[in-house]
Amino acid sequence: MVKICCIGAGYVGGPTMAVIALKCPDIEVAVVDISVPRINAWNSDQLPIYEPGLDDIVKQCRGKNLFFSTDVEKHVREADIVFVSVNTPTKTTGLGAGKAADLTYWESAARMIADVSVSDKIVVEKSTVPVKTAEAIEKILMHNSKGIKFQILSNPEFLAEGTAIADLFNPDRVLIGGRETPEGFKAVQTLKEVYANWVPEGQIITTNLWSAELSKLAANAFLAQRISSVNAMSALCESTGADVTQVSYAVGTDSRIGSKFLNASVGFGGSCFQKDILNLVYICQCNGLPEVAEYWKQVIKINDYQKNRFVNRIVSSMFNTVSNKKVAILGFAFKKDTGDTRETPAIDVCKGLLGDKAQISIYDPQVTEEQIQRDLSMKKFDWDHPLHLQPMSPTTVKQVSVTWDAYEATKDAHAVCVLTEWDEFKSLDYQKIFDNMQKPAFIFDGRNIMNVNKLREIGFIVYSIGKPLDPWLKDMPAFV
């Protein structure tokens, strides 16, 4: 029986290995992690991550050919293929701080693999890594190999949280990069045969190592670029009276452009987009391409601008102060159908409002109070380091309360901010919410999911990104 081990039981490693176990019953799959609480959660009825469809797959395969363990060295030693899915956070100190990827955990994993291995192995990069990382990993393995042979492959993930299981079942493509040597081609073929159990051959793309590594960074940069492009247009729409939804639709009907990722919003979030673009910027700078670096840096700048613009719109609309005013935040996760809060725009919006001394009440159906308080008290980039390296007891932000009910969150509020596009927010009783709010009652829709006309009929003053402005808002422009 072929044995696969994945180092890292996070948002990528867990779902990916669960689907491989489901689709390949003849392969034994072990997911390992040094975090005891995380592995305990994977072995319980309450999985550590929320992903539609994941629970059923794990329950179906766990204990048969899918195992979760903290015995990292044992499972690495026994594996034929080792996936490495550890964090590659942005460096916070030293050379490249604020831009470069921190490969500390990757290097540590590589050294451990070399140390415990007693047979030849295929080592697969699953984490998003800078171009040429495979070369560095090869050197570490080669100089510590004790005669054992390793083949390095790049197999980047292209999952979208909230639809990860569907993405794994029916991927647009599976990308495998390897060395262009007989041994490299053989390793690529071995991994290709795993995916061929359910992915059509035409959707499995093979490239050299460097192309595969760069393709992942490029894909995320292109997606984020589309979001920043439509968000830049949303600012212009507000200034001219155009409707960004109509503009996006008109643009998206062009077959050369398409309609995906053209929804204006408060900004993009998630673990990958900003981190990968900053990494891309750093790689361009290191390769003597300052103009290219500056081009990609603008994608991040527009995203920051959009979040700042949203906060400024809130404050300026409410008589230029939110001091001691209750502001309800509906949604804290970076997108619907996930509990992931990494780089969520809600963090920056909340911090901006807290800076103006607002009292914030937050409701999200999948994010815990502990996580919200941690996010609002943590320094930038610290979130992407393992939990045991984060502050043990983050400071509680006293101006923030977290509820498990949207109506409780909005009671006596001066304003409601919709920051995650959860479906349930569309069907709330907004007449009830309006009746229990301070007047004038404001709604700031950061995801453009609200029925604006209906809300205005109820009596709300509504701001929706990129839409024609409410007369009230026209008199109080937002300045950045």
From Swiss-Prot:
GO BP term, pick one: UDP-glucuronate biosynthetic process
InterPro entries the record matches: 6-PGluconate_DH-like_C_sf, NAD(P)-bd_dom_sf, UDP-Glc/GDP-Man, UDP-Glc/GDP-Man_DH_C, UDP-Glc/GDP-Man_DH_C_sf, UDP-Glc/GDP-Man_DH_dimer, UDP-Glc/GDP-Man_DH_N, UDPglc_DH_euk
Activity regulation information from UniProt: Inhibited by UDP-xylose.
E.C. no: 1.1.1.22
Pathway annotation: Nucleotide-sugar biosynthesis; UDP-alpha-D-glucuronate biosynthesis; UDP-alpha-D-glucuronate from UDP-alpha-D-glucose: step 1/1
Keywords: NAD, Oxidoreductase
A GO term for molecular function: UDP-glucose 6-dehydrogenase activity
Active site per database record: C272
Binding site for substrate: 157-161, 216-223, 256-269, 334-335, 447
Catalytic activity line of the entry: UDP-alpha-D-glucose + 2 NAD(+) + H2O = UDP-alpha-D-glucuronate + 2 NADH + 3 H(+)
A Pfam family annotated for this UniProt entry: UDPG_MGDP_dh
Expression triggers: Specifically down-regulated by H.schachtii (cyst nematodes) in nematode-induced syncytia.
Disruption phenotype: No visible phenotype.
Enzyme class: oxidoreductase
Described function: Involved in the biosynthesis of UDP-glucuronic acid (UDP-GlcA), providing nucleotide sugars for cell-wall polymers.
Family: Belongs to the UDP-glucose/GDP-mannose dehydrogenase family.
This protein's name: UDP-glucose 6-dehydrogenase 4
Naturally occurring in which organism (per UniProt): Arabidopsis thaliana
Name of the gene this protein is made from: UGD4
